């Protein structure tokens, strides 16, 4: 009997069979079976994180409809002036101009002014301080100064130093010189060549009335003066002479 129990225990140990209180047995793990077939596809997963932009694609074909015009650009740099064009044809003749004003008040003022000028001219002529010859008027202020001062005085008054261009003008200047009994400078100056005088504007003399033997300053006397008899003499420009201007 004890031998039978021992044998039973050995078999139980070897086979690893265990029984629980519910009267069923749990055996040791068996050999794995063959894999089963694939199941049905699962549901879509959630959207992943947004990736980086991809490279630009190739340029597409031209569109069918033109785009809207762009805004005006900035003004460019002005170009070089072009060549002068040909003279155009004369325009049509304009209508006749209006007649000169016949306003009585203006005419009265004009005549009064003209009368006063004639009166002033006459008074100065009687005093010997102003003489009109042709289109010229010769006048003096009675002062004796050097040549540069005379030239400045005449310029301030709107005239020039008196310079006769014919015998009639020479006689008029001479009469003023005699009136004041003082020699006067003339509007002449000597050039680079000794004895070669010209007018202050640079034009050559078209009339002369030199005293016999004059000019003979040999380049040292750059100005010209008038004697009481109306003849001329070359003289240095620093002497005091009668101021006579022409207008």
UniProtKB/Swiss-Prot annotation:
Keyword Glycoprotein in record: yes
Biased composition (Basic and acidic residues): 41-50, 83-92
GO CC term, one of those recorded: collagen trimer
Domain Collagen-like: 27-99
Glycosylation sites (chain numbering): 20, 206
SMART domains, sorted: CLECT
A Pfam family recorded for this sequence: Lectin_C
Binding site for Ca(2+): 214, 216, 233-234
Segments for region (Disordered): 32-101
Domain of life: Eukaryota
Keywords attached to this entry: Calcium, Collagen, Disulfide bond, Extracellular matrix, Gaseous exchange, Glycoprotein, Hydroxylation, Lectin, Metal-binding, Repeat, Secreted, Signal, Surface film
UniProt feature, compositional bias: Pro residues: 53-64
Gene3D superfamilies noted in UniProt: Mannose-Binding Protein A, subunit A
Disulfide bonds: 154-245, 223-237
Cellular localisation: Secreted; Secreted, Extracellular space, Extracellular matrix; Secreted, Extracellular space, Surface film
Record family assignment: Belongs to the SFTPA family.
Job of this protein: In presence of calcium ions, it binds to surfactant phospholipids and contributes to lower the surface tension at the air-liquid interface in the alveoli of the mammalian lung and is essential for normal respiration. Enhances the expression of MYO18A/SP-R210 on alveolar macrophages.
Assembly and interaction partners: Oligomeric complex of 6 set of homotrimers.
Further remark: Pulmonary surfactant consists of 90% lipid and 10% protein. There are 4 surfactant-associated proteins: 2 collagenous, carbohydrate-binding glycoproteins (SP-A and SP-D) and 2 small hydrophobic proteins (SP-B and SP-C).
The protein's name: Pulmonary surfactant-associated protein A
């Amino acid at each position: 009997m004890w031998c039978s129990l021992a044998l039973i225990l050995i078999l139980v140990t070897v086979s690893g069979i265990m029984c629980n209180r519910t009267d069923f047995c749990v055996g040791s793990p068996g050999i794995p079976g063959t894999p089963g077939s694939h199941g049905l596809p699962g549901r879509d997963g959630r959207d992943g994180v947004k990736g980086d932009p991809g490279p630009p694609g190739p340029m597409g074909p031209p569109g069918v409809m033109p785009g809207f015009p762009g805004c005006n650009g900035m003004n460019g740099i002005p170009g070089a002036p072009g060549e002068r064009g040909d003279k155009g044809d004369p325009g049509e003749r304009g209508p006749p101009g209006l007649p000169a004003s016949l306003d009585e008040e203006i005419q009265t003022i004009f005549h009064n002014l003209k009368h006063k000028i004639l009166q002033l001219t006459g008074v100065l002529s009687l005093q010997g301080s102003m003489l009109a010859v042709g289109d010229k008027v010769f006048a003096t202020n009675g002062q004796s100064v050097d040549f540069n001062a005379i030239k400045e005085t005449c310029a301030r008054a709107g005239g020039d130093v008196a310079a006769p261009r014919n015998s009639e003008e020479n006689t008029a200047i001479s009469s003023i010189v005699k009136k004041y009994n003082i020699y006067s400078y003339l509007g002449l100056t000597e050039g680079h060549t000794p004895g070669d005088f010209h007018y202050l504007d640079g034009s050559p003399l078209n009339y002369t009335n030199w005293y016999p033997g004059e000019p003979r300053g040999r380049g040292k006397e750059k100005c010209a003066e008038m004697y009481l008899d109306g003849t001329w003499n070359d003289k240095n420009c620093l002497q005091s002479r009668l101021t006579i201007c022409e207008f």
